């Protein structure tokens, strides 16, 4: 379960190859469940994108 404050690494973002490998912290989860954070301007869509949690 995703939570604000967790750190993730994007493995694959549908249609956005430049986002692969980016890391960041989840700062907001919207009503649709999309993850917003410090990795850039686009939201991660859990149903379409691949990512992993980074343990600190």
Language model: regions and residue ranges:
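Basic/aromatic-rich interaction segments and small domains that mediate binding to polyanionic partners
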Residues: 3-56
């Amino acid at each position: 379960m995703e939570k604000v404050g967790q750190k993730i690494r994007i493995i694959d973002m549908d249609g956005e190859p430049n986002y692969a490998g980016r890391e960041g912290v989840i700062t907001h989860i919207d009503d649709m469940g999309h993850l917003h954070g410090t990795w850039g301007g686009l939201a991660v869509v859990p149903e379409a994108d691949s990512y992993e949690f980074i343990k600190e």
